[in-house]
């Protein structure tokens, strides 16, 4: 396996919100990046998302134009998984579906170099189960970025049953090379972040459904009373109600009925009101 100083090329599988964000911060840190998705349109959308994000950083004087242009030039977009043949570290950021992730990791195992570290950005699914799809489970690790990736400082490193200690060290060092701070979690449902965050959001929705207070007062009470930047409804809309539901259902499946998703959360998702990305969630957006 490579030391972090030996990593030159980073692969990113998935060009959506998370994948494009990961590609952006890796390229900004100086890595060559290969960003792959299944359709050319998705790759183009991801690249446009990165360009827009870099432009915003330049407009805020958080990044100079030369560095922004250089970062974008370091990113190769592709639909060909074989383009990852020279990747030293790959981060998978596809949909939170175990069978899809296992298929991706089986394919990555076949096309990437033997030394490559294979990481998943999963927020709730088992690293150990994902790793079982490969012949190198000791080189599979969770590197869970927070959304939005270019803005959030934290990265959760998740250790599977067979993850080698050296791979864990590489995961921490890689995240730190992106100017992130890390914490470590064992391969238990939800890890640290979503084991605590998703029940918090879910309980907020339950409180609304049971008439404890309005959503505005629940959000206001949590922000003023506990000094968090967003209340549960604002945060749920930001994350995506479908993502919250999927994560909460995973916790329920693994840990029991105390994590059952609130009825109102399920109803919102069924109606297609997923938050900011659809223009409507618990709040309305332009």
Task: Tell me what each language-model feature is.
Residues 34, 51, 66, 194-202, ...:
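Structural/interface elements that position substrates and couple domains in central-metabolism enzymes
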Residues 1-56, 60, 70, 111:
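NAD(P)+-binding Rossmann beta1-loop-alpha1 motif at the extreme N-terminus of oxidoreductases
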Residues 2-3, 29, 176-181, 186, ...:
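NAD(P)-dependent Rossmann-like dehydrogenase/reductase catalytic/cofactor-binding core
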Residues 56-117:
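Rossmann-like NAD(P)-binding element
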Residues 34, 76, 91, 141-143, ...:
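Hydrophobic/aromatic beta-strand patches that form the interior of the parallel beta-sheet core
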